[in-house]
Amino acid sequence: MTIEDLPDIPLEGSSLIGRYPFLFTGSDTSVIFSISAAPMPSDCEFSFFDPNDASCQEILFDPKTSVSELFAILRQWVPQVQQNIDIIGNEILKRGCNVNDRDGLTDMTLLHYTCKSGAHGIGDVETAVKFAAQLIDLGADASLRSRWTNMNALHYASYFDVPELIRVLLKTSKPKDVDATCSDFNFGTALHIAAHNLCAGAVKTLLELGANPAFRNDKGQIPADVVPDPVDMPLEMADAAAIAKEIKQMLLDSMPLPCTITKATLPNCDITTSKAMLTTLGLKLGDRVVIAGQKVGTLRFCGTTEFASGQWAGIELDEPEGKNNGSVGRVQYFKCAPKYGIFAPLSKITKVKDGRKNITHTPSTKATLHARSQKVDVAHVTSKVNSGLMTSKKENASESTLSLPRSEELKTVAKNDATQPGCISSSSSTSSLDHKQSHPKKLSTSSSSGKKTLSKSPSLPSRASAGLKSSTTSAANNTHREGALRLGERVLVVGQRVGTIKFFGTTNFAPGYWYGIELEKPHGKNDGSVGGVQYFSCSPRYGIFAPPSRVQRLSDSLDTLSEISSNKQNHSYPGFRRSFSTTSASSQKEINRRNAFAK
């Protein structure tokens, strides 16, 4: 039923209640009010309705202002409106609107709007909680859904991260359905919605009030599965990555323990199935495998799991690029060091071929190995410049190291040089370990013996409080492979921001390796710290973190271009966010080539 279905009923004035009280008070059928524009004063200097303004107050309290117009005011997502949800809502009720009537444009009730108005930074939580309690006392139905979004009041409160409203809704609503699903979120629950939107407060409150962390949506995902991966987050969301990690751990810790007694008493057919599948693939536990042609590790587990259906392989990686220590949701499938464990479907793994067990099959590795296989004897040649060639002993050591992938190379170097002063263990960042490889610019010739020696960097302090070891030495004291970025080097971040590398290594806020860059202008997000962990020091808003794929060495042409990009960034249109897509990155490189050619 819509308001248009009512015969010649004026929406303005108090006469509506007197003439047609049966349509509103105590009515079981909710009314959907027609769509209207928000009324604005003729001399208004701003584009939104401000209930604190005198001219706006005249309109708000005018009995001739219709319910449809008041709903239109509620749709304005500005603090001036959302923080006065109770004043505007009471005016709607005064005009005879039923507590469960709906806005014709959004199909939302007053309770839906109230749950939105509790959003931090826009509305006022205390006001929203009081008005929500008032609406529920008047008979507001918390189970009603918007027919546009299929969301009920609990879904809205979870989406906008208002734990105080979640408590009110679940305390007063009957029946208490904390796991009600929503079709717009793959039939996930409020816990799925909160987890997907990184609403830590809502996740914690829902778990406390009995939400099921093992509930699976239509895609078979539990709430922990829908938490965004920090690696996929934009550059500006380094702080959100720490929240994502916290939420996922919170959800995994709350997973129910598996019933191992029942499994122990039943014949385990899964073991037979797993062995048969491994035999078909020509694999066995302990074999070296490659995951999706990228990550290399050792097969430690094969079988069914609690976190997903089907057969899964558990792999202990060579590098800390995994997700766990062999356990998921308090179920230990195999044991390994933290971040060295990962699970993958059997279709994603292949056995490493003999003779290439330690090689990750990447194009760069193949090209490097091909180049190294072509050796020329230049021992009899006397070079006028330092060619970077080492003694036969060093050369043999280098060859054995270079035949390994990056992960094994770091481990071998750390093991061989553990007793040497100034060396760094394998737990240090990749940047600090790159000095183990030979580099022509870092070799010096002794005048007395004519032998070439490799300069070593001094020993480095560790950050025990941060739980990681990062290199703080200057770029001049580190030796890298050719083309690698060094600490202290000026770089360009995502083709726009210019800064200096101050940190490189693993972090607590996201897996993988990250560059910490001190920008030349205050366009950053932090002071070198994220989530209370200090990775490097700089002025506030001068620090930013970026993955290696988004950082490039600053050349002369890039330096000029970065100034142009920086100026454009300062004059970007409001309401639009830059998209750092692959297309824009390739266009950036094209511009660089054109500038270089013009010179």
From Swiss-Prot:
ANK repeats lie at residues 65-101, 149-180, 186-215. It comes from the Eukaryota. Residues 387-482, 565-599 are annotated as: Disordered. Residues 468-478 have a biased composition (Polar residues). InterPro entries: Ankyrin_rpt, Ankyrin_rpt-contain_sf, CAP-Gly_dom_sf, CAP-Gly_domain. Transmembrane segments: none annotated. Residues 443-462, 576-587 have a biased composition (Low complexity). The modification Phosphoserine is found at S557. Keywords: ANK repeat, Phosphoprotein, Repeat. Residues 303-345, 505-547 form the CAP-Gly domain. PANTHER family: CAP-GLY DOMAIN-CONTAINING LINKER PROTEIN 4, DYNACTIN 1-RELATED MICROTUBULE-BINDING. This is CAP-Gly domain-containing linker protein 4. It comes from Rattus norvegicus (Rat). The gene is Clip4.
